């Protein structure tokens, strides 16, 4: 229903007839391929394979399934997502039993992750409860595996949240295994109903009672919290787990490379900064897992024009603490000679000035690695790589 007008009817496809459910006694499954039915003097499409596409918001295509549909091995929402639906809505009457809410929560979130979609789950509440069944009104809005907002049960609470439809669209385009929706639409006999969607004003967004689940942020009508540090969890335990996981992944990758090449020596340019420090810790972990003596780790500190006592002392302390070999090679004279060779002004601190030092350090590391028969450990980070630049 949109603006007081019925634009499509989606029937239930899977009817439960077990435990407390006996729907198949009185009902039959709805048809998949849409047919036209008459409603209030107008022809309206009816069928499970209906898509509602917003012509004013290209990334918004809505499909629907009913209650039990999402609990079956092959839910209709799978076909809907493959046909192009970015948001799936589920009108449900799922009764309460002990522990069912947690299963229901995981089910909705996992379905949104599998389909790379938004999933809006609206469940029956107190007004639908009878002497046979109790409905808790557990409403959930999930996006690509993340629960954006969930209502508290048994208090008839409404919820709302923002979905990043452009991100969902981008994720699907990135996945080569997510098929072209046109073929799925044709195969499933899908009918697309066009509708328009007026943008919600800031005032109306703020006026909605979100019960502190999606309060608006200052300066805009965005209801969801946008984490300024998305890769760094705020919860300390989760953050520690994430850091441990990152170190383990990197160490395992380096371990495999050391095993494959038969190298028992590693060379690191240790500046005392963050990136080279983490690279050293990863290397130490990889060596320990292979039971290779840490003395096979060669830390090279190469002071030049911008080196401070603090970073130099950090490098020396780190190498000593982990039991690695430390070697100092001052590259100031070599870089100065290079500037003279190319006629570069020493007082001109431009890209050439900075990169010449980095290139000289790399040459030193490569040569030492050749001498000891080892591998140079890269100290570049993902931010550099994203910008097309590497240490």
Predicted regions, residues:
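Hydrophobic alpha-helical scaffolding
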Residues: 66-70, 94-101, 232-244, 301-308, ...
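Generic, well-ordered alpha-helical scaffold segments in large soluble proteins
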Residues: 111, 249, 253-261, 273, ...
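A glycine-rich phosphate-binding loop feature that marks nucleotide/adenosyl-phosphate handling sites
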Residues: 263-276, 332-335, 381-385
């Amino acid at each position: 229903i949109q603006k007081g007008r019925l634009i499509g009817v989606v029937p239930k496809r899977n009817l439960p007839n077990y435990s407390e459910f006996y729907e198949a006694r009185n009902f039959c499954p709805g048809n998949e391929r849409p047919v036209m039915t008459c409603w209030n003097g107008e022809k309206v499409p009816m069928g499970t394979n209906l898509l509602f596409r917003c012509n004013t918001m290209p990334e918004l295509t809505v499909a629907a399934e009913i209650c039990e549909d999402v609990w079956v091995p092959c839910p209709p929402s799978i076909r809907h997502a493959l046909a192009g639906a970015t948001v799936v809505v589920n009108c449900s009457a799922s009764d309460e039993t002990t522990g069912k809410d947690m299963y229901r929560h995981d089910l909705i979130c996992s379905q949104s992750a599998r389909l790379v979609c938004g999933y809006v789950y609206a469940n029956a509440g107190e007004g639908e409860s009878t002497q046979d069944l109790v409905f808790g009104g557990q409403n959930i809005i999930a996006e690509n595996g993340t629960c954006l907002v969930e209502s508290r049960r048994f208090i008839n609470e409404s919820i709302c949240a923002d979905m990043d439809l452009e991100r969902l669209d981008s994720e699907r385009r990135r996945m080569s295994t997510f098929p072209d929706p046109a073929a799925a639409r044709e195969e499933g006999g899908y009918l697309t109903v066009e509708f328009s969607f007026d943008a919600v004003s800031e005032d109306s967004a703020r006026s909605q009672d979100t019960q502190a689940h999606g309060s608006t942020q200052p300066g805009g009508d965005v209801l969801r919290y946008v984490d300024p540090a998305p890769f760094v969890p705020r919860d300390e335990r989760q953050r520690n787990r994430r850091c441990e996981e990152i170190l383990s992944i990197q160490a395992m990758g380096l371990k495999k490379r050391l095993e494959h090449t038969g190298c028992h020596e590693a060379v690191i340019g240790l500046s005392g900064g963050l990136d080279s420090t983490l690279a050293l810790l990863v290397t130490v972990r990889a060596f320990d897992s292979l039971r290779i003596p840490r003395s096979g780790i060669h830390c090279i500190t190469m002071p030049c024009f911008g080196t401070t006592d603090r970073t130099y002392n950090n490098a020396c302390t780190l190498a000593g603490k982990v039991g690695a070999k430390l070697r100092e090679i001052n590259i100031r004279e070599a870089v100065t000679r290079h500037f003279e060779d190319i006629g570069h002004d020493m007082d001109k601190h431009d890209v050439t000035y900075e990169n010449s030092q980095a290139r000289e350090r790399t040459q030193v590391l490569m040569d030492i690695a050749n001498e000891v028969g080892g591998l140079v450990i890269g100290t570049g980070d993902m931010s550099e790589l994203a910008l097309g630049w590497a240490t």
